[in-house]
Curated annotation (Swiss-Prot):
Gene3D superfamilies: Cytochrome c-like domain. It is found in: Mitochondrion intermembrane space. Its main location: mitochondrion. It comes from the Eukaryota. It holds the Pfam family Cytochrom_C. Binds 1 heme c group covalently per subunit. Electron carrier protein. The oxidized form of the cytochrome c heme group can accept an electron from the heme group of the cytochrome c1 subunit of cytochrome reductase. Cytochrome c then transfers this electron to the cytochrome oxidase complex, the final protein carrier in the mitochondrial electron-transport chain. It comes from Cucurbita maxima. This is Cytochrome c. InterPro entries: Cyt_c-like_dom (IPR009056), Cyt_c-like_dom_sf (IPR036909), Cyt_c_1A/1B (IPR002327).
Length: 111
């Protein structure tokens, strides 16, 4: 399903997904350091591979995608297909509702 067909996201459900599937490598807390993956604070509207102080793969820098709801929706389906060569080992979220929920949470938590 494309982003245009995505269900509305539930940020509470998205927070649970973040805690179980993302938080071991990422944080959303402003001013917190990077973990294995970059801090996601300020994610929306930022270009991939540009968070200060994090060592990105050339793939993430060269892809130069602007993170927004649609790009995250596509990326989170299959990160390695969307950015071949990414360091992110997460296989993705296959269910449209899970992606919509996670994005709703990230929109609130990273602002």
């Amino acid at each position: 399903a494309s982003f245009d067909e995505a269900p509305p996201g539930n940020s509470k459900a998205g927070e649970k997904i973040f805690k179980t599937k993302c938080a071991q490598c990422h944080t959303v807390d402003k001013g917190a350091g990077h973990k294995q993956g970059p801090n996601l604070n300020g994610l929306f509207g930022r270009q991939s591979g540009t968070t200060p102080g994090y060592s990105y793969s050339a793939a993430n820098k060269n892809r130069a995608v602007i993170w927004e709801e649609k790009t995250l929706y596509d990326y989170l389906l299959n990160p390695k297909k969307y950015i071949p060569g990414t360091k992110m080992v997460f296989p993705g979220l296959k269910k449209p509702q899970d992606r919509a929920d996670l994005i709703a949470y990230l929109k609130e938590a990273t602002a």
